Swiss-Prot record:
It catalyses: GMP + ATP = GDP + ADP. This is Guanylate kinase. It comes from the Bacteria. One of its GO terms (cellular component) is cytosol. Keywords: ATP-binding, Cytoplasm, Kinase, Nucleotide-binding, Transferase. ATP binds at G18, P19, S20, G21, A22, G23, K24, G25. It comes from Clostridium perfringens (strain ATCC 13124 / DSM 756 / JCM 1290 / NCIMB 6125 / NCTC 8237 / Type A).
Length: 216
């Protein structure tokens, strides 16, 4: 009887970054709404919960002592201190979801993504690009929450961040959210078909199959 090829059912870690205004959040939201096997990682933080925020949904809220203990236990894929509070991506919860066959999205900044890349070598790193710098500028202006000074700061930062695109596996130009989502879906499908994501018994099962056909 023909043996089945056993595939690795482990999920794929998808790390998404890009400059402010590139549309990362909108793309991630669309992916989550469209696919029930894609989940977003919930970050941990030591800051106080805001009104309406739920522990384990918006963030994992920790004390500074708890956070530092997790750092000591190497339980973060990446972490940083921002304005006196700690933020990080819990390694154990991400690994649990991946082991359950769930595809996990990390929407994080570039520095965080590069730290994750050091630990998660099998991750898929996708950089979201705007169709043009002028379009990026207009998107940020439309938010209506930026002063001329902060707008210029964000724009200069975006120029610097785009230089990091070569550190990623893929670049997706977001000129249309639907098209950008389709490109990421294609990337995920291709990654699922990579030989190195199949279990080591792939060749063994094929050898057994050939042996059965030749000698049985």
């Amino acid at each position: 009887m023909m043996n089945k090829i056993h595939k690795d059912n482990r999920g794929v870690l998808i790390v998404i970054s890009g400059p402010s205004g590139a549309g990362k959040g909108t793309i991630c939201k669309a992916l989550l709404e469209k696919h029930d096997d894609i989940f977003i990682s919930v970050s941990a933080t030591t800051r106080n919960p805001r009104v309406g925020e739920v522990d384990g949904v918006n963030y994992h809220f920790l004390t500074k002592e708890e956070f530092k203990q997790r750092i000591a236990e190497d339980d973060f894929l990446e972490h940083a201190e921002v304005y006196g509070n700690y933020y990080g991506t819990p390694k154990s919860s991400v690994e649990k979801m991946l082991d359950e066959g769930k595809n996990v999205i990390l929407e994080i900044d570039i520095q965080g993504a590069l730290k994750v890349k050091e630990k998660a070598t099998d991750g898929v790193f996708i950089f979201i690009l705007p169709p043009s710098m002028e379009e990026l500028k207009q998107r940020i202006i439309k938010r209506g929450s930026e002063t001329p000074e902060s707008l210029m700061t964000r724009f200069k930062s975006a120029y610097k961040e785009i230089n990091y695109v070569s550190k990623y596996n893929y670049a997706v130009v977001n000129d249309n959210v639907e098209d950008a989502v389709k490109k990421i879906e294609a990337i995920l499908l291709a990654e699922k078909c990579r030989v190195d994501r199949l279990k080591e018994n792939l060749l063994e099962s094929k050898e057994d199959e050939m042996h059965e056909q030749l000698y049985d």
